[in-house]
Amino acid sequence: MATSTRMPTAQDFADFTEAYRRLSPHPDHFEEFLSRMSASNADLQGWSDEQLARITAPTLLVIGDRDFTTVEHAALMLRLIPGSQLAVLPDTTHMQVTRRADLLLPMLRRFLD
């Protein structure tokens, strides 16, 4: 059976679960958190080109090069959101972005300065 290298792995989910339980002020609410996230994702309609073009806040788009959000899709968003910036983290999936502090933190500092 073929699997996509762009989708989160079982290890990604295990790491996410462990981090939530370790860092959350309410680690016992994890199942409720997952339920709410699932409901939110099920209702996700996305944004139209017109809605993206109306964004006025400074915007930094961050994806991994192995993210399920493709570089092409992120580049389209970059073109649509005025003045936005795009960072593509190497050898990184969607769920691994926050684990790349070595790359992410300097970018965020520059963006927020």
Regions found by a protein language model. Give the residues of each.
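Short, conserved loop/helix-junction motifs that constitute active-site signature segments
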Residues: L52-T56, R79-I81
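Catalytic active-site module of serine/aspartate enzymes centered on a nucleophile-bearing elbow/loop
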Residues: S84-D113
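Short beta-strand/loop motif that positions the catalytic acidic residue
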Residues: R54-I55, L61-I63
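Flexible "cap/lid" loop of the alpha/beta hydrolase fold
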Residues: M1-E18
